[in-house]
Structures are given as structure tokens and as C-alpha cells.
């Protein structure tokens, strides 16, 4: 057997290879171990979103009576582009495969259907139970450290049938999960043998339903499954904002034959639902996990005492270690309970419920009495309607829907009552509102640890500059000795520490911190680009020019890096982080002035102006990044050159490349990115001339790159004779272009 494709368990083969090998195998009377040819069934590829199972079945009806058409979809019900057609009677599959079938003007890919097989357990040589030796004594403390890979020992679980170790490709580690397909098969096999796999238990009288789209609600799905028995509950799984994840569960009151329901075919809104048994995934109990002892790192040497609590220092930064109130062991290092830590609503709900039953309260938050958390709120629901809906449980004191700074609902809120109510009873009930089930839970007020637990860092002021630099101490254009404003904490009289916030312009999209320093402090505005998405201020000051990271605001949308350096001006583009979405202005300083105009990339999307100062003046035109829709020119001066990328923010709305500024005049071509939709040219000045090429990015609509070369620094503020010379040269080139076009 080829080493490139050994017969390992769960190995798969491509459809093309399996088709050829299976055909050869069928002609010789034997079957390959990779898979078996399914009789009277044809593989169909090249299926797009316009094709449904009914149309495909009618298309193949010429070859025989079609038994079933199955289009393979993912978990959300989106077609994967292929499927299978099975026939009732015997048909000549090779004849069908050899024919050419066109559907919706597209040729389908045909082949025999092959059912892939897994090797039986009796053919696999099980490996004996081998336990790695313990680590040397000096590494005993990292034996259970989740952040240490050297001696991290996986939990070894023997196979319940063969008593051998499971395959290393899928070890049964704590908190392991299994996919629904795999769990369905394994659980069915387990149920037939009378034992349950540790990954999860089959939920009786409950069916998994996949392929649910936005048009389906719980009431309709419940009525659809009513033919099999009395439906107890229908639950569509949604995210925190109430948007469906595409699957859910249907539970029945009485005993039903789940296998019979799963084997049936249910079509809903013209779409086939995916059915399977419901499996409740399990995590290993806490008693099976060996807790690691309380180990505290030694304090730093005396010369590093001042950085012990410095949030910008990573060397000796010591996390606060909080023993678990139940086991008295340290929490996992992957989620330490640090000051100001927050917990999610689901985790806090479970932990708070357990805590309340034992008579103590977790430090993360306290349960708010007579208040209920309500999730799954959409834009159609208002506070009055929600209050009337909860009026059956008691006199409603207040309904509060949580919104962002712009007033848009975040999808959840709280309902508080005047009198004492049974919150657990309300949480256990099922409330449907506008045909949608609300998510309920106890309300938990998150807490921050008291200030006495935080070791403040002393007030440290940078030394003043030498005398020869005193004049540049407060010069906003000087980066050498630019001194940040130090604001003491009004309580502790120590310097406030500021942390990095996710999704800020000083970070990449993954949330990793992009260290920036030596800028002036910016004023704070609601919803500005220097704040996080919740509207909290991200104070940044004393920046130096910082490198560009993928997908940062100083790069193009395609993710290619656009290095920016030695600019006063940044490239402006629509929807950039230097604009807000609500229309609040973000003042930027030390630019040359230019007028503001509606709907330009120098403004917010609502049309409010973004005043920028100390730019060279240029005329303003409506609705164009570099010109208006009528073709009037928008001359731009005095930029340093930077590389242009496809789909760059310094391009027109067509997305073609606009290599910037100060070129010598060049001919205008229809549909070029240097023109507006009417074809008028956008003249640019003071670059060396370059020839025009067919199909280049600066001409036709194909978007091919037009290589540019021999950049020069543009002149600064051309005035007087110099300005007249520039316009004279531009006029010469324009006249030459007109002659060329007239000759053509």
C-alpha cells in the first residue's frame, strides 16, 4: 500500500479516486476496503443554491423511478454543492454517469455513489496501556500545570469494550466534546449494548433538529412534529443576541420511537430537516481531576520591587491567587480570578445558584433580589410590553433593556418586582413573547474587589529634559521629550494604570495589544475610534509612530500591510476608525485646513463634518472620495508617496487602484479609477510621466496592476511661479492627450 494513503482508521478517499478504483474492483468481483459502491445510486456534484431536491429528482426521472434525492448540507442547512440520487429499480449507473446532464445552464458532475467504511475494531491492533513515566523531582510542580506542555499528562481512558487505550488521535481528555454525527453513531451502538459512552448521554424522548432557518419558529416546528406524539417543548438554540444558530431540540411528553422519527424525512418550508437523537454532553466530575497545590511565585529581587504591581511590566507581574472556596485549591491559570474580573451570565448563574444553596456568595457578584435576567430580546420588544408580560408573577417595579451608547438594544435586560417573588419559579417557567422564547435567569450584580486589595504603584514622574530642549517640552510636533499628562487617582493619589481594550485602533482585531506611545493625549468623545465598542474611554497619549499590523486601521481592507511612515496626514477612507458611526466629531490637529463636505471620506457616515486642521486647502465636492459625480477635479497636493494596494481605502468606489498624487498628466480612459462614473479625468501632478497600458489598474475595469516607478518627493506648498509652472506642464500634457484622442 502506498505510504501516502495508509489504511488507517477513519481514513477517507477522494470521490474521483474511489470512483476509478471501485469501478475496477467491481469488474473483478471484489470490493476495496475504502468503501462500497451503493447500488442504484448516483453521485451528483456541481449543485448550486438555485437547485432543490424536487427539481433534481424530476431531471433524473428519465432514467428510472427516483426513490430519494439528498443534497448534502452543513449544520446550518447550507448546501455543500453535492448530493445523491437513488432509484427504486435497478438502473445502469455507468450509463447515467457517462451521460451529460445540464441543469440551470450548468453541467452536473456525475459518478457512482461510494459509502466510505471504517475498519472494524477486530482488524485494528490495539496498543497496550502505556503510562508515561513521572517527571523528575524538579518538575513535580508543573505536573498538573495546564500551561506547561513538557510533562502534561493526558488522562488515559481504556476502551470499555476492548480494555485498550483509545486511539491517540482522539484521546478522551477531560471536558472533551464530540460532534453530533459521531456521538449519534457511537451512542446508538452504545445503547444497543446496554452501556453509555462517557462523552454524553442520549436524552430520552428528545430529537435533535438541524437545518433550521430564520423563517421557522418554535410553534411551527412543534406543530410539524405533533404527528409523532404530544410535544412537550421545542427549543431553538440561539446566541446571546437571540439569533438562531440553525438547530434545536424537540422533546415529547410520552415515550416515542426516536429512531423512527430520525429515520423519517421531514420537509419544512420546502427544506429537509436534519434529524438525530439528542445527546447531552458531559464533563468529567471534579473528583476525577487532581487539583494542583497552592504555589506562589517568589517575590522579585529588591531592585524590582517598584515594578511588582506595574501593569506594563510582564517580568514579575504577579496575579492574585484566590483559592477555590470549595476545594481550597488554586483556580486554573487559564482563568485566574484577578481583580475586576467578570464572569459570563451563564457561568455566574450556575455558580451563584450553587452558592446560594450552600449559604455563601461568590466574590464575582451577588444575586439581586426580586430581579430576573431576560435574554433574547429583539428590536420588536419594548419595556412596556415586557413589563405587562411579567405582570402575572407580581407587581413590576422596573423593566430595563440594556442598550449601547447609540440606543440600540444589546438583546437582554432586567425585570425587577416591587414585592418578594419566587425568582427560581419564574426562571423555570417558559415565557414566549412575539413567538420567541425568552432566556431567563437570576440577575447578578458583578463586583470589583475593594481598593485595599490592590497594591498601588507610586507616583513616578519622568525627569525633565536637558536645558537645550526646554522649548520643545510642550511642542506638540516634537516627539523626543513629549511629556504625558500624569493624572493621580483621586482616592489613592497614585497614577492610574490604563489597560488595552479589545477592538481598539491601538490593537489588532484579535485583541492582541499594539503598543503605542509618545502621542499627545486626545480628547474623549462618545463612540470615537479611540474607544472600545461599549463606549468606554481608551486614553492614549505619548505615541511614537508604530508599525502596521494586519487588518489595522492603517492598512487596506484585503489585509495586506500598508506601511505608513513620516506622514502628518493619514489616508482617509469611508468607515475608518477615525470616524464615528453616530456623527460625533473626532477633532484631529496639526493638519492643514480644508473645508468639510457631505458624505466624503473625511466625514462620518451621518454626514457630520470631521474638522481637520493645517492641511493645504483644496476645494470641496459632494459625495466623492476624490471628486464629485459630475467629473470635476479634486486636486490633492503635498502628500508623501505610499504604496497602493488593490481595494485600498485611497481608491474610488469601484475599488481599483489609485496610486497617489503628484504624477504628470496622463490620458483619461473610460471606466478608469482616475475618473468618475461620467469619464472625466482626475488630473494628478508632478510625477514622472508613465505610459498607459491596456488592462492596467489605472485604466480598464479588469483591475490588473499598473506598475509605477520613479517616485519623487512632491513639492511643498507650490506657490507663485512654481504653481504656474505646474499648471503649465499640466496644460501641455492635457493638450497632448486631446491631440492623441482626436487622432484616434
Swiss-Prot record:
Q: Does the keyword Cytoplasm apply?
A: yes
Keywords attached to this entry: Cytoplasm, Developmental protein, Differentiation, Nucleus, Repeat, RNA-binding, Spermatogenesis
- Give the record's disease field: Spermatogenic failure Y-linked 2: A disorder resulting in the absence (azoospermia) or reduction (oligozoospermia) of sperm in the semen, leading to male infertility.
One annotated GO molecular function is:
mRNA 3'-UTR binding
Domain named DAZ: residues: 497-520, 521-544, 545-568, 569-592, 593-616, 617-640, 641-664, 665-688, 689-712
Q: Where is the composition biased (Low complexity)?
A: 11-27, 176-192, 341-357
Annotated coiled-coil positions are none
Q: Print the domain comment field.
A: The DAZ domains are essential and mediate the interaction with DAZAP1 and DAZAP2.
Skewed-composition ranges (Polar residues): 1-10, 163-175, 328-340
Q: What else is known?
A: DAZ genes are prone to deletions but also to duplications. In a population of infertile men, DAZ genes deletions are associated with oligozoospermia but an increased number of DAZ genes is not a significant risk factor for spermatogenic failure. The DAZ proteins (DAZ, DAZ2, DAZ4 and DAZ4) are all encoded by a strongly repeated region of the Y chromosome, in two clusters each comprising an inverted pair of DAZ genes. They are very similar, which gives their indidual characterization difficult. Thus, most experiments do not discriminate between the different members. One can therefore suppose that reported interactions with a DAZ protein involve all the 4 proteins.
Q: Which InterPro entries match?
A: DAZ_dom (IPR043628), DAZ_RRM_vert (IPR037551), Nucleotide-bd_a/b_plait_sf (IPR012677), RBD_domain_sf (IPR035979), RRM_dom (IPR000504)
| Family from the record | Belongs to the RRM DAZ family.
On whether Membrane is a keyword of this UniProt record, the answer is no
Q: How does it assemble?
A: Forms a heterodimer with BOLL and DAZL. Interacts with PUM2, DAZAP1, DAZAP2, DZIP1 and DZIP3.
Tissue specificity annotation: Testis-specific. Expression restricted to premeiotic germ cells, particularly in spermatogonia (at protein level).
Q: What does this protein do?
A: RNA-binding protein that plays an essential role in spermatogenesis. May act by binding to the 3'-UTR of mRNAs and regulating their translation. Promotes germ-cell progression to meiosis and formation of haploid germ cells.
What protein does this entry describe? Deleted in azoospermia protein 1
Please list the residue ranges annotated as the RRM domain: 40-115, 205-280, 370-445
Q: Give GO cellular component annotations, separated by semicolons.
A: cytoplasm; nucleus; protein-containing complex
- The UniProt entry lists the main location of this chain as cytoplasm
Compartments it resides in: Cytoplasm; Nucleus
